[in-house]
C-alpha cells in the first residue's frame, strides 16, 4: 500500500491556542494515532504554517506535544525543517529553491510605501525582522468597508507582482493572537507558500493528490486546500466565506483531525 500524506495548518488547526484540560485527552488521542500511523510507515506528516519555526516549537511545548511531524514548513512555508535523529534540521535543498530569486526587505518597504502613499493607509510589521528573512508579514487594519479593503489589498498584490514580488492577504485570526478587524499581509519568495510546499512533497515522495489529506482554518490555507481532493476546513474556523467553500470537520480541533485521519487511512474517502 502506498503512503499517504497528511498536511496540517498549525494555529487553530493542529494547535488550539486555548487548549484546556478537557482538550488534552483529545490532543493525546490525536498524537497517539499519528504516532501509530507513522511507526507503521503508513503516512508522512507535515505542518504548513505562517508562524516562525521557534513559535511552533514554543507552542508545542506549552501543551507538551510529544509527536513530531516529519516536516515543519514555517514562515508561510518558506522554510522547511525535517525531524532527523532527535532534532529538526533545516533543509538546504528547499532553501536553495526558495532563494533562487532576489528577495530584499528594502524592495518590500518600497512596495508598501507606494501603496501607503496612494491610499493613505498603514502597514504594521507583525514582529521584529532579522536579516535575510524569507517571510515578511504585516497587519493592515480594516478601513471599515470590505469593498474598500479589497480594492487596496488587491492593488498591493498587483503592484508587488509588477515588482516581481509575491504578496498575499487573508483575514487575521484573533484566536491565534491577531488583532480584530485586520488582515495578514505576507510577502514570500515566489517559490514558497503552502501550495508550493504541498507540491514539493508530492514530488519528493511521489505521492498523488488523491493520497493527500489536508486541514486548515483560514485564508492562507485556501490555495492549498483548493488544490487537494481531500481537504477539510476546521469547524472551529471563523472564516464564514471559507465555510461555504470547503467541507467542515465533524468536530473542532484535535477531535476533528483524529476522526477524519482515521477515516482517510481506512480508505473511506477512496474512489
Curated annotation (Swiss-Prot):
Top-level EC class as recorded in UniProt: hydrolase
GO CC list: cytosol
The entry's keywords: Hydrolase
Coiled-coil annotated residue ranges, if any: none
EC numbers: 3.-.-.-
Gene Ontology MF terms: magnesium ion binding; phosphatase activity
Pfam families noted in UniProt: S6PP
Keyword Transmembrane helix attached: no
Alphabetized InterPro entries for the sequence: HAD-like_sf, HAD-SF_hydro_IIB, HAD_sf, SPP-like_dom
Domain of life: Bacteria
Family to which this protein belongs: Belongs to the HAD-like hydrolase superfamily.
PANTHER family: KANOSAMINE-6-PHOSPHATE PHOSPHATASE, PHOSPHOSERINE PHOSPHATASE
Protein name: Uncharacterized hydrolase SA2005
UniProt source species: Staphylococcus aureus (strain N315)
Lineage: Bacteria, Bacillati, Bacillota, Bacilli, Bacillales
Amino acid at each position: 500500500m502506498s503512503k499517504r500524506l497528511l498536511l496540517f495548518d498549525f494555529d487553530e488547526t493542529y494547535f488550539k491556542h486555548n487548549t484546556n484540560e478537557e482538550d488534552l485527552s483529545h490532543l493525546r488521542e490525536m498524537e497517539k494515532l499519528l504516532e501509530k500511523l507513522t511507526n507503521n510507515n503508513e503516512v508522512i506528516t507535515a505542518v504548513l504554517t505562517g508562524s516562525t519555526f521557534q513559535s511552533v516549537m514554543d507552542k508545542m511545548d506549552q501543551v507538551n506535544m510529544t509527536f513530531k511531524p516529519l516536516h515543519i514548513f514555517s514562515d508561510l512555508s518558506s522554510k522547511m525543517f525535517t525531524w532527523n535523529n532527535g532534532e529538526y534540521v533545516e533543509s538546504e535543498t528547499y532553501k536553495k529553491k526558495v532563494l533562487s530569486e532576489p528577495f530584499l526587505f528594502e524592495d518590500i518597504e518600497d512596495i508598501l510605501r507606494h501603496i501607503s502613499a496612494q491610499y493613505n493607509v498603514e502597514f504594521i510589521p507583525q514582529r521584529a525582522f532579522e536579516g535575510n528573512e524569507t517571510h515578511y508579514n504585516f497587519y493592515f487594519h480594516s478601513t471599515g468597508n470590505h469593498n474598500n479593503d479589497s480594492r487596496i489589498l488587491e492593488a498591493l498584490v498587483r503592484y508587488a507582482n509588477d515588482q516581481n514580488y509575491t504578496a498575499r492577504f487573508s483575514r487575521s485570526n484573533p484566536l491565534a493572537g491577531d488583532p480584530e478587524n485586520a488582515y495578514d499581509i505576507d510577502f514570500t519568495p515566489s517559490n514558497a507558500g503552502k501550495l508550493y510546499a504541498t507540491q514539493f512533497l508530492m514530488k519528493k515522495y511521489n505521492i498523488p493528490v488523491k493520497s493527500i489529506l489536508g486541514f486548515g482554518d483560514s485564508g492562507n490555507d485556501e490555495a492549498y486546500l483548493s488544490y487537494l481532493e481531500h481537504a477539510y476546513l476546521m469547524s472551529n474556523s471563523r472564516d464564514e466565506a471559507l465555510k461555504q467553500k470547503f467541507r467542515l470537520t465533524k468536530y473542532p480541533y484535535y477531535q476533528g483531525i483524529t476522526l477524519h485521519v482515521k477515516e482517510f487511512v481506512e480508505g473511506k474517502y477512496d474512489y
